């Protein structure tokens, strides 16, 4: 048997499917201040009287990340960019950012060296601001991540305990503005999403549901709950995707 739960704008809907047959449905009102409670409420209604050992797969949609971004409730992140020549980061609408010298070209060759004193000064400014999350993104870092890694190395010495996310680890695509935005949002939502995912895992364990859990992505594909911890932004528009499908 398969379970699907969709957190919608008005109701949270759940369905239990056995083969090609819909065995049971359930729904509860959606409380946008308690999305986890909505999911579990619908789940409890759905599995009442059901042998949970026969459940083979659980697929969830969630608007958690979408809501965090839309309501500006994400964690603060210092965005550090190494754009190189030919771009103006102010055109990207990424919010405040720190711009560093240095450049890697499209072949992965260094054409402009980093300025270490500039990096240390940037780290000092971040430390003074009290922000403990730093996203570092270079224009062609997916070709050669050396600059991102060097910036991370220097900043981690000045910002011990801070979480530093590097653009080339988040995405291998060439689109620099999109990679910068994705890296920033990944770091800004990761901790809240991890708490949400952990709560789901524990709740299913308490209900003796051992089936693998998947999160619906915006493209209609699914991602294992554990795998989604590294890329919570993959769940943006998870809810609307479920509505369309």
Predicted segments with their positions:
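N-terminally biased helix-coil "hinge/interface" segments that flank
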Residues: 1-245
